């Protein structure tokens, strides 16, 4: 077994840097300790690292999880005896085995409750023996804070709120870690002395890079439209610490003309639709996928809608390596597991997911970029009666031999032809799959034979003759029969 002192100068500082770089915790530095706080599904988890003694850390949990904290600290004391254990792998192990820690220490919790119930102090002076023990490590101080809070509530039921707040702040400053506001000051005891004098030191809280980038990107995305969340469905990760997708390739669709485009976006991207010249804007905020998070990132769109995600190029960090060893995966697709081996530790890295899903988080603007309106779409009043013919049998000024109206799928409105649609709407028409007969005003699906299934009439005049027939027959010289003398006459005599 390698001693801790021999490993002090080699990789302990590097492990802390890798942990801060991968998981972006909230960092608070004191004189002798470093606090790394991370939110999780189980609440706020804080790792307290001793600057003077490498590989000596303790875990702090929320107020209602003290019994879990004792079990985790017992495991942490012997975890670094294994040479392959790193700070990042230790944190992931605690999250993955949360339920086992939750059930292993129920007896100790019951004993702690019995000890607290047996103590019944009458005055606040009974708290002095416990307050003298605050010179110990921070993990013990949090347990004492819980005991002190419980006894204060039992001994002083009618005390003022100001007295209780003063008692809590003078006992320890570690309790501020569990408040909603970020702590700016930390109270710690001087080491090596009797521990009666406490020093108050202002701590400048360094902001991590992720929070700065997120704030900058949030300002840029305030003017954009909808916000989508990209998540992997049922991800299966083996020996993966973190996974990032800095560049996203996807297919988008214009909200005006529904024209599809394939793009590749790193942070910001803007383009003009090739069909309707609509401006499309996107902002990609990549996230971090780990065993407890399946969110790939956040996508902000304006003037377009995401349709599908192309194969993704990801950067995967190995969980077993001490340094930040990144392995590149190219073309990760759904339902296709990809396997690679780490270049340093030679362990296999497996990445697999079932599907990529889009979830609409915020709809701040409509599809055209304006504010979202709560009004429903007004129904089109056609002024027609089923069974009776349409006005002019459905013919319009553009197509005088077309006896039908079309219901266009782009706006679900009825027009005689595509030119009538474009003259009334501000977007380009899409193919109409339903028609209204000009003779009976009955709606049906589009058919190539142009025969109404209700009345049997032809909605388009069928050309059967190959002769001129006084202008009622064939008028195209190319398709006209060569037996018709009008086919070879001069053009100024033909019309």
From Swiss-Prot:
Domain of life: Eukaryota
Alphabetical list of InterPro entries matching this protein: Znf_CHY, Znf_CHY_sf
Bias kind Basic residues: ranges: 484-495
Cellular compartment(s): Cytoplasm
Extent of Basic and acidic residues compositional bias: 473-483
GO biological process: rescue of stalled ribosome
UniProt key word Cytoplasm: yes
Zinc finger intervals, CHY-type: 389-457
One of the record's GO cellular component terms: cytoplasm
Residue positions binding Zn(2+) 3: 437, 440, 452, 455
Stored Pfam families: zf-CHY
Alphabetic keyword roster: Cytoplasm, Metal-binding, Zinc, Zinc-finger
Coiled-coil stretches: none
Name listed for the protein in its UniProt record: Uncharacterized protein C18H10.09
């Amino acid at each position: 077994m390698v001693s801790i002192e021999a490993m002090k100068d080699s990789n302990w500082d590097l492990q802390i840097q890798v942990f801060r770089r991968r998981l972006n915790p909230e960092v608070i530095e004191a004189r002798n300790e470093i606090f790394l706080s991370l939110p999780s599904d189980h609440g706020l988890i804080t790792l307290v690292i001793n600057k003077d003694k490498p590989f000596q850390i303790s875990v702090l949990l929320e107020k209602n999880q003290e019994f879990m904290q004792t079990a985790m600290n017992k495991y942490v004391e012997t975890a670094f005896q294994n040479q392959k254990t790193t700070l990042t792998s230790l944190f992931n192990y605690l999250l993955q085995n949360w339920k086992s820690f939750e059930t292993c220490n129920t007896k100790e919790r019951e004993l702690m409750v019995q000890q607290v119930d047996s103590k019944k102090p009458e005055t606040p002076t009974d708290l002095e023996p416990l307050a003298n023990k605050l010179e110990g490590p921070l993990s013990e101080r949090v347990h004492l804070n819980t005991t002190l809070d419980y006894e204060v509530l039992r001994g002083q039921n009618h005390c003022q709120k100001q007295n209780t707040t003063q008692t809590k702040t003078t006992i320890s400053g570690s309790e501020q870690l569990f408040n909603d506001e970020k702590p700016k000051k930390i109270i710690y005891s001087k080491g090596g002395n009797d521990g009666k004098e406490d020093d108050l030191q202002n701590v400048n809280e360094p902001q991590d890079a992720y929070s700065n980038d997120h704030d900058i990107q949030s300002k840029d995305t305030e003017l954009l439209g909808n916000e989508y969340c990209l998540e992997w469905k049922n991800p299966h990760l083996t020996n993966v610490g973190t996974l990032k997708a800095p560049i996203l390739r996807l297919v988008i669709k214009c909200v005006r003309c529904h024209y599809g485009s394939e793009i590749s976006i790193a942070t910001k991207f803007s383009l003009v639709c090739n069909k309707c010249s609509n401006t499309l804007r996107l902002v990609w905020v990549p996230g971090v996928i780990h065993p407890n998070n399946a969110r790939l990132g956040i996508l902000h769109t304006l003037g377009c809608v995401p349709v599908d995600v192309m194969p993704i190029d990801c950067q995967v960090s190995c969980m077993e390596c001490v340094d930040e060893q990144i392995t590149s995966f190219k073309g990760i697709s759904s339902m296709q597991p990809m396997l690679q081996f780490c270049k340093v530790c030679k362990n296999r890295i497996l990445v697999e997911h079932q599907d990529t899903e889009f979830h609409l988080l915020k709809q701040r603007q409509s599809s055209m970029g304006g504010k979202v309106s709560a009004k429903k779409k007004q129904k089109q009043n056609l002024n027609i009666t089923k069974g009776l013919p349409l006005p002019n049998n459905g013919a319009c000024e553009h197509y005088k031999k077309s006896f039908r109206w079309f219901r266009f799928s782009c706006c679900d409105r009825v027009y005689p032809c595509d030119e009538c649609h474009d003259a009334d709407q501000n977007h380009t028409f899409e193919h109409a799959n339903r028609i209204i007969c000009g003779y009976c005003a009955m709606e049906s699906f589009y058919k190539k034979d142009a025969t109404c299934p209700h009345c049997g009439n032809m909605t388009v005049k069928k050309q059967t003759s190959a002769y001129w027939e006084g202008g009622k027959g064939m008028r195209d010289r190319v398709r006209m029969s060569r037996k018709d003398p009008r086919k070879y006459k001069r053009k100024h005599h033909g019309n």
